[in-house]
Amino acid sequence: MSSYRDGSKTNIDKVKNNLKQPNMYKLLLFTLMTIVCLGGFAQKNAVLVEAESFANKGGWVVDQQFMDVMGSPFLMAHGMGIPVKDAETTVKFPAKGKYRMFVRTRNWAARWTDQDAPGKFQVLVDGKAVAPVFGTESSEWAWQDGGTIDVSKTTATVALKDLTGFNGRCDVILFSSDPNYTPPFDDSQLAELRRKLNPATVNVKDGGKFDFVVIGGGMAGTCAAISAARLGLKVALVQDRPVLGGNNSSEVRVHLGGRINLEPYPNLGNLVNEIGPSKEGNARPYENYEDDKKMQAVRNEKNLSLFLNFHANKVNMKNDRIESVQATNTETGEKLSFSAPLFADCTGDATIGVLAGAKFMTGRENSKEFGESTAPEEADDLTMGSSVQWFAEDKAQAVPFPDIKWALAWDEGKAEHLTRGDWNWETGMGLDQVAEFERIRDYGLLVVYSNWSFLKNHSSGKAKFEKQQLKWVAYIAGKRESKRLVGDYILRESDLIDHKVYPDGTAPTSWTIDLHYPDPKNTKLFPGKEFKSIAVHKPIIPYPIPFRCLYSQNVPNLMMAGRNISVSHVALGTVRVMRTTGMMGEVVGMAASVCKKHNTDPRGVYANHFNDLKQLMLKGTGNPGLPKIQNYNMGSTLPAKKQ
């Protein structure tokens, strides 16, 4: 299988030495009592500044994609080779005097190269740059020593100054009046330090009691929330980005795919048609993805409360049921708790289900498990990858691009002579799409910059690219697959190929069984480090997804819509496109209303009240009178069988 497991070592040891620690191993084994003492020290003599909370973020962006792995959102200087505007904030110190300064950061390209560092930045205190340049040491998240600063006032302006435009990142800045203090590297101790120094973020506020809480604001979650709200439910939609749409937002820029308004429920998809963009194409200008259209549709619903920039990362259980979900604001650290009798996991990564102990699958099943001819003989960890798309635009004059030292080794044989990277710029197959996702995204950035630098500075055809400038490179990677929650039924290849339709069929999937693999040509050039993929298609007859695939087998009040539903890896190839996931959301919202009507769980809807759900699916929750604009990228399909 494809892998980036290149055996490169981190620079953690170097960082530890730079921090002049007498015994790092003792530090990593601090007892709970030590942490408590540290907390007392911290409150009196230290200040911790979370970068994502900066009052003025300038040109830096908040990146929350990996906070469950590395501990926090962070600020990133995503300038595509042009330094971004400074981020600034005001910091209050407990007293004047000298402070040791530490910055938690990383040299994100050090895993692949030891030549220079891409994401260099400085920290300015009251306009004066602290001596070290940051982002130059460890390939992993670690503290970089900033030396000692002299604070002449108890209030100071602290700024982050980007030096390169190449994704420098800052998690947190720590000031300590103890000249011998060393901050913890251990994840649990660091989390405790954050709580001690920012006690306001410890309190969990009541976010409200709802009939239905939807986690994840992609097409699936947005449609689920609107659908339920229109049927009279009090709904919360919790989304960890500032926009809605997920992969179809302007942050990722993947166009919608699949067909809507199909039998046996031709009004399913009206809501997708209502909120979906009218233009097709991947990696296109911002306006094509109509973020405002989705946002306005949600804000128009009086029964729907929207919580943007809240990342759900904790569940409270009672009697094997989800009682509430806790979410953290990705900028302020504020924590809210949302209570409801019913929840929907539309996160894509099955985040809520996994936290709740729901059964899930990952990787490829073997061919015998579900009797699938397309599946491998032996199960493995291969998943479809994530895309870092990009495009360039023409300018009136020549535009330079840095000849980067930290680029991957490139030549004419490796060069991609393109001005747009589409879906097939795909990385991470064979890696954990959750635990290793920052590495996956960063490799996607690295190959885009390496290729573009070569085209602009060394290619034999560089004249063609002289007036081209990178207009957009995704820093939110477009993910296809990670974890799939297990429902009362697991959809499999034979159901689709043999068209075994079940009585609880709902939203129809029409896309081909579309599975991605490393491009063999790219493998020859980048063995084990591929960044391009191929798609292998197997067409199907439009197939109604069983409702039993849309709720958890062992968490009774949890439903799901999107790419994390109950399907095999092979079956995921068809259901994962966004018009299909949007229709799943419509159905899940309808099912939530049936649950409330009959005071039952999703399994009860299947067993006793499915006719109620049928009637809602026949009627739909979208506006049927709107022009049908979802007529692009519908995909190949086989004609429906005659009944």
Can you describe what each PLM-predicted range is?
Residues 1-43:
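Bacterial Sec-dependent N-terminal signal peptides
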Residues 43-205:
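Extracytoplasmic
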Residues 199-202, 206, 247, 309, ...:
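Flavin (FAD/FMN)-binding glycine-rich loop and adjacent Rossmann-like elements that form
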Residues 206-218:
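Beta1/beta-strand and adjacent pyrophosphate-binding region of the FAD-binding site
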Residues 221:
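N-terminal Rossmann-fold NAD(P) dinucleotide-binding loop
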Residues 228:
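Aromatic pocket-lining residues of Rossmann-like dinucleotide-binding sites
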Residues 233-234, 239-318, 361, 384-392:
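Conserved N-terminal/central alpha/beta ligand/cofactor-binding core
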